[in-house]
Amino acid sequence: MNKQNNYSDDSIQVLEGLEAVRKRPGMYIGSTDKRGLHHLVYEIVDNSVDEVLNGYGNEIDVTINKDGSISIEDNGRGMPTGIHKSGKPTVEVIFTVLHAGGKFGQGGYKTSGGLHGVGASVVNALSEWLEVEIHRDGSIYHQSFKNGGSPSSGLVKKGKTKKTGTKVTFKPDDTIFKASTSFNFDVLSERLQESAFLLKNLKITLNDLRSGKERQEHYHYEEGIKEFVSYVNEGKEVLHDVATFSGEANGIEVDVAFQYNDQYSESILSFVNNVRTKDGGTHEVGFKTAMTRVFNDYARRINELKTKDKNLDGNDIREGLTAVVSVRIPEELLQFEGQTKSKLGTSEARSAVDSVVADKLPFYLEEKGQLSKSLVKKAIKAQQAREAARKAREDARSGKKNKRKDTLLSGKLTPAQSKNTEKNELYLVEGDSAGGSAKLGRDRKFQAILPLRGKVINTEKARLEDIFKNEEINTIIHTIGAGVGTDFKIEDSNYNRVIIMTDADTDGAHIQVLLLTFFFKYMKPLVQAGRVFIALPPLYKLEKGKGKTKRVEYAWTDEELNKLQKELGKGFTLQRYKGLGEMNPEQLWETTMNPETRTLIRVQVEDEVRSSKRVTTLMGDKVQPRREWIEKHVEFGMQEDQSILDNSEVQVLENDQFDEEEI
């Protein structure tokens, strides 16, 4: 092996100290909520994946232990166990110095995720304790750390071994992760499965040893990203078998897989050296550019587009497309835009992906002539639907004259007095009676009320033209005023927050789900920006005493109710709210609309693949997947209504005091 790829003690480079990590963890892992907690695991897992990516090892085991700690074990080369040029044991350098890793300066890896060299030390800094066990050069080595990264032992040789690899076990520090230090099996599962899809020869096992939660899953996909696309499209009506292309250009390896379904939204998942690039980048641009050019050339060749016709827009060509674009870029070419590393900036990646797709796609279209013709016709229909969407957007923009004027005159929208779109809020309220209370109870300056009277359409099943015909959805589109679908522009929104306020019963929950499905599919940037909320009206009102000694309390959960009952003692009256209309305007303001006292749930998309699959399963045409999901996840009891707070996945933002790291 040449020096370029020699994973040794000298290939570990040190850039800076670790002191700031515990003070500002958000800078290193994004947040200290459940996303940040799970990010710790990904940092260590991605180091193991980098070993596999570079041809060392093929197995990774992740185990949630009984005590709540987690272990990540691989069968790679094992971390270097000698003395680093700085004079300290190399293992200690890797786990205690920020930016110490084999990925800086091409010392140990040809390709890697680029940002994961910081991983081990950051995880150590944010852990109550951490232990590392290394199998290398015939020996087993062990070192432990405690209290956020301080070595509690030196590197100790424990015995002999024929294996190679690294095992890291750590317990997150509950003084850093105050919300929870409990790992979620399903969240880890999605991410680990993703890694297995991207590397054909990688086998991953996920174990949960916690009492009452025992579970095990294995991930190994011999057909790689082809199976990834099938997985994403599960439950959807697909139009053809998955197509795959591979090639190399500019020293960059390119893998592409795609499949069309009968839906109206596109889903492109892009990766660089097995790391997800959520914000896309040059590789995604290359894919889209080549696809648009090749499709238009083909459409003209088969005479579906005439000389006088405009080219098809890329958005129309990609309607209903699911694609995975995976590139492997040498370390010296790897560039990201911004600090988050979620957008690729390597210019060579654009031409590499463009070249591979432009080379392979024309042959595929010629070979599948009948399918290709139907895909072109599908794109032409999408173009027509987009024109309708553009018209709706223009109507909304000129609302002072036309559509919005009609909306206002019809008595639906009660607007806010202020024109400050940075502060204004739109409440979507279930029913007229609650809408009346909300109108009277609101702060007129910045809160607008839109009562929903009719049936909200299920936008997962409906065609785009039918969505525009639905009065409730159409009113929402015009009220928000930022367009819809691919033409949605978040900067044009009339409101900083859209708040869904429904009764605390199954009908109210159904309306919430229908509205969230619409926002997720057709106003996704609004959800991604964290600007869609669910209002949380109380379930109970407790009243005791009269006159000046009268005390009124509200409870949002049964737990809060029990606490208040004990606190108030005997002699109180209890009211169970079944609907928003049972509250007078003052009560509705105080409990649900006043920014000083209300509780809101922010709707967030943490994993787009997972979210999209759930929407398809629960809101799509196919009954069997929905039945199976419900039977697996829903416990049926006598009580029909329960608080959304009973869901452990919900994180509540109270009194509008949003933590910087949660936004």
From Swiss-Prot:
Disulphides: none
Binding site for Mg(2+) 2: 503, 505
GO-annotated cellular components: chromosome
Gene Ontology terms: biological process: chromosome segregation; DNA topological change
InterPro entries given in the database record: DNA_gyrase_B_C, HATPase_C_sf, ParE_type2, Ribosomal_Su5_D2-typ_SF, Ribsml_uS5_D2-typ_fold_subgr, Topo_IIA, Topo_IIA-like_dom_sf, Topo_IIA_B
Gene3D superfamilies associated with the record: 3.30.230.10, 3.40.50.670, Histidine kinase-like ATPase, C-terminal domain
Composition bias, Basic and acidic residues: 387-398
Toprim domain segment(s): 424-538
Coiled-coil positions: none
Binding site for ATP: 7, 47, 74, 114-120, 341
Keyword terms, alphabetized: ATP-binding, DNA-binding, Isomerase, Magnesium, Metal-binding, Nucleotide-binding, Topoisomerase
Cofactor note: Binds two Mg(2+) per subunit. The magnesium ions form salt bridges with both the protein and the DNA. Can also accept other divalent metal cations, such as Mn(2+) or Ca(2+).
This enzyme's EC code(s): 5.6.2.2
Gene Ontology MF terms in the entry: ATP binding; DNA binding; DNA negative supercoiling activity; metal ion binding
Recorded catalytic activity of this chain's protein: ATP-dependent breakage, passage and rejoining of double-stranded DNA
Family classification: Belongs to the type II topoisomerase family. ParE type 2 subfamily.
PANTHER family (alphabetical): DNA GYRASE/TOPOISOMERASE SUBUNIT B, DNA TOPOISOMERASE 4 SUBUNIT B
Oligomer status and interactors: Heterotetramer composed of ParC and ParE.
Protein name as catalogued: DNA topoisomerase 4 subunit B
Native organism: Staphylococcus aureus (strain Mu50 / ATCC 700699)
